């Protein structure tokens, strides 16, 4: 028996306006609709068999989508064409493609840590820097700068 292999796509949803919120089902419908437009009935039917929104965090507008390995490239080529979800203008930004949810979670932590360190470097006041250091400590337990800051 052959093991089915999946790909997990970590995406960030960027909204035109602050305060817009979408749901997991709306993301699924928008992706299926766009796959149908680009690849026809066969593409939509093949993708629907394995396409699912596994994780969606409305607070950070980050989502993890699962699809079979065979159709991952089709989904990745479809994502830039998704412009609206539930009549809300959005931009979908692929952050990472991995073979497990855990690898996507690790990638998200790595991305967020880099963002915090870059915010630290661009902070103008000592108070801002102190707040960012405390945020990094609360999340990771330690602070280490990897070739981003000397001193």
Q: Where is each model-derived feature located?
A:
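Surface-exposed, low-hydrophobicity interaction/linker segments
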Residues: 1, 12-54
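C-terminal low-complexity, charged extensions that often adopt amphipathic alpha-helices
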Residues: 2, 99-151
């Amino acid at each position: 028996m052959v093991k089915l292999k999946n790909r997990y796509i970590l995406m960030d949803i960027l909204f035109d306006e602050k305060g817009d919120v979408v749901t997991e089902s709306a993301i699924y419908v928008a992706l299926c609709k766009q796959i149908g437009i680009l690849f026809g009935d066969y593409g939509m039917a093949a993708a629907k068999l394995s396409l699912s929104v596994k994780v969606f965090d409305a607070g950070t507008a980050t989502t993890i989508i699962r699809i079979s390995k065979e159709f991952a490239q089709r989904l990745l080529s479809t994502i830039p064409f998704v412009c609206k979800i539930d009549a809300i203008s959005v931009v979908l930004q692929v952050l990472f493609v991995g073979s497990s949810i855990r690898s996507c979670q690790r990638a998200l932590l790595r991305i967020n840590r880099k963002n915090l360190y870059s915010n630290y470097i661009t902070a103008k006041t000592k108070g801002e820097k102190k707040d960012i250091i405390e945020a990094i400590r609360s999340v990771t337990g330690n602070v280490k700068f990897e070739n981003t800051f000397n001193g």
